[in-house]
Amino acid sequence: MKQTTISKKVEGVGIGLHKGEPIKLILEPLEANMGIVFYRSDLGSSFKAEPKNVINTQMATVVGNEKGSVSTIEHLLSAINSYGIDNIRIVLDANEVPVMDGSAISFCMMLDEAGVIELEADKKVIVVKKEVEVRDGDKYVKVTPSKNPKFNYTIKFENPIIGKQSYTFEFSKENFLNEIARARTFGFLKDVQKLNSMGLALGGSLDNAVVIDDSRILNPEGLRFENEFVRHKILDAIGDISLLGAPMVGDYEAYAGSHDLNHKLTVALLSDEKNYEMVTLDEQKAKEYAKAFA
């Protein structure tokens, strides 16, 4: 099984969630063994999508270095991961990925336009060998060994519109497109108003998020799925876990997880070589792990 990249450059424009200004996004092919690289064209600085470059996880996942950063990367990374793309250059002229419609479907459309091609180098994957768990009170995220990766997520909110929701997603590109990619980010009106007063979430609107006001959903079209909220949490998790630097072969489980817990999980997993094995998918190994990339 070979490494992949996109076959041609594609461009898009969208609004930044926090500043509310137009942002140009360019996806470019990249050679083998380069991974996922962000490039800030306005600063001339670049950095890889990997745990050591994560600098903030408060409201979104942020990667960067002393020369600059990029925020709200998880939706784009979720699409890239689900399409099995190993190497890609993400060019931005601002400090955040455009929010698009609050889901990953716009990024999937860009990847469809670009196409995916194989490179000469064999694909590398991170195979989970031991259970690794990170907790914060009753909240937790964990990974366990499995050759047929699944994401099992449970959320619990006091708000009756969300309540308690659980969903199990069997990882594949087809399943991602059908079950996860269209699930939008969500928030509460009171929180949005507070963020706006702080100069944040200025690009947030009913066009790019599900907004909840006490006991009702403000979006006139309603939800895309009955359990869209927990599906979006899985979307986020797929993006956050892709920061491992190679596709993960293992099961992911979360209860009331977060970007912060996901980041701590990737760090914990990679902190001990007994937790995982970096496997090169030559012809023999590709057959062994074929189900993980169906």
Curated annotation (Swiss-Prot):
Entry cofactors: Zn(2+)
Keyword vocabulary terms for this entry: Hydrolase, Lipid A biosynthesis, Lipid biosynthesis, Lipid metabolism, Metal-binding, Zinc
GO terms assigned for molecular function: metal ion binding; UDP-3-O-acyl-N-acetylglucosamine deacetylase activity
Recorded catalytic activity of this chain's protein: a UDP-3-O-[(3R)-3-hydroxyacyl]-N-acetyl-alpha-D-glucosamine + H2O = a UDP-3-O-[(3R)-3-hydroxyacyl]-alpha-D-glucosamine + acetate
Sequence positions that bind Zn(2+): 75, 232, 236
Record-listed E.C. numbers: 3.5.1.108
A GO CC term assigned to this protein in UniProt: membrane
Pathway(s) annotated for this protein in UniProt: Glycolipid biosynthesis; lipid IV(A) biosynthesis; lipid IV(A) from (3R)-3-hydroxytetradecanoyl-[acyl-carrier-protein] and UDP-N-acetyl-alpha-D-glucosamine: step 2/6
Positions of transmembrane segments: none
GO biological process: lipid A biosynthetic process
Enzyme class: hydrolase
Domain of life (superkingdom): Bacteria
Family annotation (InterPro entries): Ribosomal_Su5_D2-typ_SF, UDP-acyl_GlcNac_deAcase, UDP-acyl_GlcNac_deAcase_C, UDP-acyl_N-AcGlcN_deAcase_N
Catalytic-site annotation from UniProt: 259 (proton donor)
Xref: HAMAP family: LpxC (MF_00388)
NCBIfam families: lpxC
Family note: Belongs to the LpxC family.
Function: Catalyzes the hydrolysis of UDP-3-O-myristoyl-N-acetylglucosamine to form UDP-3-O-myristoylglucosamine and acetate, the committed step in lipid A biosynthesis.
Designated name of the protein: UDP-3-O-acyl-N-acetylglucosamine deacetylase
Organism: Campylobacter fetus subsp. fetus (strain 82-40)
Lineage per the UniProt record: Bacteria, Pseudomonadati, Campylobacterota, Epsilonproteobacteria, Campylobacterales
This protein's encoding gene: lpxC
